[in-house]
Amino acid sequence: MGSIGSMGKPIEGFLVAAIQFPVPIVNSRKDIDHNIESIIRTLHATKAGYPGVELIIFPEYSTQGLNTAKWLSEEFLLDVPGKETEAYAQACKEAKVYGVFSIMERNPDSNKNPYNTAIIIDPQGKIILKYRKLFPWNPIEPWYPGDLGMPVCEGPGGSKLAVCICHDGMIPELAREAAYKGCNVYIRISGYSTQVNDQWILTNRSNAWHNLMYTVSVNLAGYDNVFYYFGEGQICNFDGTTLVQGHRNPWEIVTGEIYPKMADNARLSWGLENNIYNLGHRGYVAKPGGEHDAGLTYIKDLAAGKYKLPWEDHMKIKDGSIYGYPTTGGRFGK
């Protein structure tokens, strides 16, 4: 399940490739077009180098970059679907692979900020999953909070795929939501700089362990004249151990074999540490069937729209003004 056996398609399961795409320096729409061409070229090259690969993943911001002075401008935004996603779809169809791509998506409501979106395209060239980032990296990211929930789709080798984006992976409830809906391979695409490198590794492992699912995570790599992006693609087993760990190299291709049926079997056969089941059946030895209400106050309050921390009134940062964003809501940064 490590790199030495990851050149061809396994007999069961599938081979995944996560691309540590160099952080793009983007100043114009031509730069975005160049990135798209580079991503498509990389997808075909990866398939040629790893003929058995069935899923190729590109990190957050690989299409449009992180030019914070322009990332909200109409010039930099794309539509989903649109001609750019059609180009990705054609590439997946030609290479006969599933692909995961990052798009900063124009909001259909012109009075609201754009979405940070991920899509999965199948080998027939169809968008089979569209996810809008639920938890933007506040206060620095200006994206509108996602409205599509946490979708799950069928993938290669018996997998059920879900995608989270960067900071989403720090929210354990979101990984649990994906697993609760059947996901057994949780993908994380990110554009993190080195400040949270350790936490990235930790949460990729914990998301796998808490939910008995594989995690496949990949980050941008390289320097954009402001920050260094750490790469470090990571594939974690459903028991929370790291199967493959990338380095900090731009263009590194992190590959690994995934066996979704093994995760499925663990969910069916494990007693001890089957925590996703135990959450809703606590104490099932003493009480047949267990207690179904976990009695967790924050879950009840969140569901009722009353979530509030004991220290919330005293928090210093609760809007984007520290980064110069307006606090009145509505569309800004055009």
UniProtKB/Swiss-Prot annotation:
Domain CN hydrolase residues, every copy: 14-260
Catalytic activity field: formamide + H2O = formate + NH4(+)
GO process terms (BP): putrescine biosynthetic process from arginine
Top class in the EC scheme: hydrolase
Keyword set, alphabetical order: Hydrolase
Gene Ontology molecular functions: formamidase activity; N-carbamoylputrescine amidase activity
Superkingdom in the source lineage: Bacteria
Signal peptide: none
InterPro entries recorded: Aliph_Amidase/BUP (IPR050345), C-N_Hydrolase (IPR003010), C-N_Hydrolase_sf (IPR036526), Formamidase (IPR022843)
One Pfam family this sequence matches: CN_hydrolase
UniProt-listed Enzyme Commission number(s): 3.5.1.49
Main function: Is an aliphatic amidase with a restricted substrate specificity, as it only hydrolyzes formamide.
Xref: PANTHER family: FORMAMIDASE, NITRILASE C965.09-RELATED
Family to which the UniProt record says this protein belongs: Belongs to the carbon-nitrogen hydrolase superfamily. Aliphatic amidase family.
Protein name: Formamidase
Species this chain originates from: Helicobacter pylori (strain P12)
Gene name as annotated: amiF
